[in-house]
Amino acid sequence: MSTTPAAGVLDTSVFIATESGRQLDEALIPDRVATTVVTLAELRVGVLAAATTDIRAQRLATLESVADMETLPVDDDAARMWARLRIHLAESGRRVRINDLWIAAVAASRALPVITQDDDFAALDGAASVEIIRV
């Protein structure tokens, strides 16, 4: 039985799940969490692309809820990890959306798991120290 890690990186899907009322397995979410600049960008796109003012307000509230959270940047270590993961995917014949690849690279470069509801990360689980926790 695995234990909940001390810290982790929340993927965009966790914020969207909260916004839309999807259930999260809170017991698997670490006490210390951060997110990435990539997730912030995805949440901002959601605000800008909202079809109605009500949806825009809801998405803006989600974006604002992240304001005080530690936001991890894409740095040289993350870029090196991204390149390793990209080659791993090419060699294994699998694909991951580009933003998810960046989120995984930022997390793995800091030895942190990705906390997500997306199945998209499955192709990376275990690759180059990537740990994925589905909540």
Swiss-Prot record:
<dbReference type="InterPro" id="IPR002716">
    <property type="entry name" value="PIN_dom"/>
</dbReference>
<keyword id="KW-0479">Metal-binding</keyword>
<feature type="domain" description="PINc">
    <location>
        <begin position="9"/>
        <end position="130"/>
    </location>
</feature>
<dbReference type="GO" id="GO:0000287">
    <property type="term" value="F:magnesium ion binding"/>
</dbReference>
<dbReference type="InterPro" id="IPR029060">
    <property type="entry name" value="PIN-like_dom_sf"/>
</dbReference>
<comment type="subunit">
    <text>Forms a complex with VapB5.</text>
</comment>
<dbReference type="GO" id="GO:0005576">
    <property type="term" value="C:extracellular region"/>
</dbReference>
<keyword id="KW-0540">Nuclease</keyword>
<dbReference type="Pfam" id="PF01850">
    <property type="entry name" value="PIN"/>
</dbReference>
<comment type="function">
    <text>Probable toxic component of a type II toxin-antitoxin (TA) system. The cognate antitoxin is VapB5. Has limited RNase activity on substrates; activity is seen with a VapC5-VapB5 complex.</text>
</comment>
<keyword id="KW-1277">Toxin-antitoxin system</keyword>
<dbReference type="InterPro" id="IPR022907">
    <property type="entry name" value="VapC_family"/>
</dbReference>
<protein>
    <recommendedName>
        <fullName>Ribonuclease VapC5</fullName>
        <ecNumber>3.1.-.-</ecNumber>
    </recommendedName>
</protein>
<dbReference type="InterPro" id="IPR050556">
    <property type="entry name" value="Type_II_TA_system_RNase"/>
</dbReference>
<keyword id="KW-0964">Secreted</keyword>
<keyword id="KW-0378">Hydrolase</keyword>
<feature type="binding site">
    <location>
        <position position="100"/>
    </location>
    <ligand>
        <name>Mg(2+)</name>
    </ligand>
</feature>
<feature type="binding site">
    <location>
        <position position="11"/>
    </location>
    <ligand>
        <name>Mg(2+)</name>
    </ligand>
</feature>
<comment type="similarity">
    <text>Belongs to the PINc/VapC protein family.</text>
</comment>
<keyword id="KW-0460">Magnesium</keyword>
<dbReference type="GO" id="GO:0004521">
    <property type="term" value="F:RNA endonuclease activity"/>
</dbReference>
